[in-house]
Structures are given as structure tokens and as C-alpha cells.
Amino acid sequence: MNRVIGVTLAVCFLFLPQTVSAEEPGLITKPSKYSVTKTIKRFESAIQGKGYVIFTEIDHAAAAAKFGLQSLPRTVVVYGDPKNGPARLQQFPTLAIDAPPKALVWQDAQGAVWLTLNSAEYWANHVYKRHGTSASADFIKKLEKDLEEVSDTATK
């Protein structure tokens, strides 16, 4: 009986890191009913509809394949706010280590597709503070609303 419990716990802990990373405070993680590719396209379309621009995509699985490694799909979409971003980066140059914002579209070992973003609260209370700046409550509220709408559009 103890062996069965031990094996069961070991199997649970094997999958724990992926589950914990998806529920980390400061992250918005939503399951997508679409493929990785379609979720990326839907995210990009939705974020552009809010006035943001797409700078690039980083396909981690494609990069791994170049070295003969296999990886589940994981693509980072780098996007930004052309109205506010450049001025803030000029004033707070170290912010560029964290900005522009990114979205991660990924597939887990069970085949489920997920979208993960940093939350508005995380940007306000961690990223901006880290670089000696802040954002107004109105800006954070708008960002929170934008991220919620965009993530819903991309995944539902």
C-alpha cells in the first residue's frame, strides 16, 4: 500500500512544475480551444485591434529543432504600445530588459493549448517599480481590461 501511495505521489510531483507555472501569481493563463498556431493568430489580431503592434514571434520549438532537439510548441509573441512605450523606455532605459510585453502560447504534455501573459497588477507592482516608474490607476485598469478581452478573444 505504501508503495502505491509513493508511486502515485511521485507521478503527481512529476507533473506539478507545469501546473504550478501555469498558476503563478502575476500571470494570466487561460486554456485555448484552438491550436497553438490559431491561438497566436487570434491573439495577434486581438492585440492589434487594441492599438498595439507585433514586433516578433519567437518559436522555441523551431529553435530547438535546429539543434536536433524536440520540444512541445512554445511561441512567444512580443508586442507593444507605440503610443506609450517609446517615451517610457526613453525615460527609464532599464525598463527595456522587461519590455516590450510578451505573450506565450504553449502546448502541454497532454496536448492542451494555453495562453500566458503577465498581469496588469504584475506590471504595476513589480516591473514598473523595479525600474523606478509607475503607472496611473486608470492606465492599469485599462491594461487589465485590454488583457482580459484580448486573452478571451484569443482562447474562446
Regions found by a protein language model. Give the residues of each.
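Beta-strand/loop substructures that line and gate deep hydrophobic ligand-binding cavities in soluble
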Residues: 103-133
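Extracytoplasmic/secreted envelope proteins and their assembly/folding machinery
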Residues: 37-40, 44, 61, 140, ...
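Compact, glycine-rich, soluble single-domain proteins
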Residues: 48, 59-101, 105
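N-terminal secretory signal peptides that target proteins for export/translocation
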Residues: 1-2
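Soluble non-cytosolic domains of exported or imported proteins
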Residues: 30-38, 55, 134-141
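C-terminal partner/receptor-binding element of secreted or periplasmic proteins
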Residues: 121-156
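Bacterial N-terminal signal peptides
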Residues: 6-17
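Terminal, regulation- and interaction-focused segments at domain boundaries
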Residues: 22-51, 152-156
